[in-house]
Amino acid sequence: MKNFFKKINRIFQDYMREKRLKIGKAIWDKKEKTNIIKGNNFIENNNIKSILFLRYDGKIGDMIVNSLMFREIKKVYPDIKIGLVARGAAIDIVKDNPNVDEIYEYHKDRKKIKELALKIKEEKYDLLIDFSEMLRVNQMMLINLCGARFNLGLDRNNWSLFDLSVESDKDFKWGEHITKRYLAYLLKLGLKSEEINLSYDIYIKDNSKYTEFLNKIKESKRLVLNPYGASKHKSFSIDTLENIITFLKDKDIAIILVYFGDKFKELETLEKKYTNVYIPKSITNILDTALLIRESDFVISPDTSIVHIASTFNKNIIAVYPPNGGKFGVDHLVWAPNSDYTKVIFCKDKSSSYDEIDINTFELEEMEAEILKMINNSD
């Protein structure tokens, strides 16, 4: 009966979403077309002096990967102004990035979105870039009201609001790594493929915050173990953590547990129980976690944002992902770790389409075997 009501609610929500999007598109899918001067280089041919990136989803991992675009544009065109719409913890990832000139904080409140758009419109951006696979009504409104000279989006050839479009299955493939999609955007702008570096950037100003903490670690190697994913179903349980910790207790590897908010409280018993477990008591933002990862050797995580941070610093990674590539069958490819040494382990599938996966249902024996391979790879 519970699954029946879930099914009915999902059908209703999908129906209403489709209606809202149609109405929103009818209202906001409008733009006076700007003449595009065609050639081999959109930026130069159309005198692009400023670019606004829209990253209003608040996803940390996406922002990390997006950093390659900021850097590569600035590398060729250092005088171009790069603005960025962002929200939440994703702002922390780019707040010290020298390739971003201005950050605009996004709030979901409709009134604040309009105020933000009017502020941006005064800046008269030449080009707006949106990465959304599905545009919600508030996002359509934001793009419309920003008033950029050109708008570039994803699969938007049938939209009046967009002047340019990166096309899936033509400019990139859905099953390719996310960096290939961002490469397609850069090529659309006229950058040369052979000159583009697809690595990520994270800039950390305070490099000494954990010096004392790290100096107390007696083991010769350090492994960052991140328990947390996007939901409780995608987070490691205490039992899972203990299994990994116990397996590593005689391997001369320190385990650094990372967390957010008040999650420290549910982990501190592990530090008291195991001599190879260390928990810093002052993780206040994602850059703190990034610093700990940078100063470690290995990373194990069920969360893609941590995986992307580890990839930035080319750390050896074991990631635990849902089976079958997630909802669309390609997540494990699109969001794969990007270090020299990586391994993705899959948990078991959910029992029905209305249940949640449990990330803890991976095979422990497989995890142990992969940990040994990862450790040996670093010797």
Question: Which functions belong to the PLM regions below?
Answer:
Residues M1-D379:
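Catalytic machinery of carbohydrate-active enzymes
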